[in-house]
Amino acid sequence: YADSLSAVLDQTVAYSPEYLGKNDRNGALGAWLADLSIAEVEKYLKDKGINEQIHIALFNSGGVRTSMPQGDVKRSFIYELMPFENQYVLVRLKGQAMRDMFEYLAKDASRGVFHPLGGMCLVAEGGHWSRETTVGQWRLNPEREYTVLTTDFLLKGGDNMNFFADGTDVMATDLKMREAIMDYFSHTDTITIPKDLRYEIK
């Protein structure tokens, strides 16, 4: 049994053209994880007849447990990257909750902690978020509700992400992050590395 399990984990699932370090500045590994999460969850929802645009994906850097090697990526990487049983959830944030989220991200980024982020570019200056921060291509509209993709752990205030407590319309899924990563690799030969900035520190 151990030999057969080892053989499965040693299978090559994709090719990575670059090394992606889990602690790299601007977090390309986190950006990759956020982007695939948005795509996989939107597909999951569509299969259930739900058309929901996800504006932002936010996870925690502490949940990303290893780096991605350049070259062949083995199935074991999925379990090393994501050993937790985290499930995706969607929550709507607006106004002050969005500002609190930006401030949290800016403070952590200023000390070199870049949380996996998709759908936005956080601009920080002097340890605080700047109004140049954009969601999509647009600056924050405090009257608008934004749909944020995260995990059940963070929704409950994990990693001190307490701003999620001010969210509304929470939508739970039964899709685990690890399952989404596996599905991504099932239809991906060569990994696409995100090149757009998720953080800009001034």
Feature locations, PLM:
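Charged, low-complexity, helix-prone segments enriched in Lys/Glu/Asp/Gln
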Residues: 1-5, 41-44
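Long, non-catalytic terminal segments
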Residues: 2-6, 16-23, 29-34
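Coil residues (strongly favoring Ser/Thr
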Residues: 4, 11-12, 190
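Feature captures C-terminal
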Residues: 31-34, 38-202
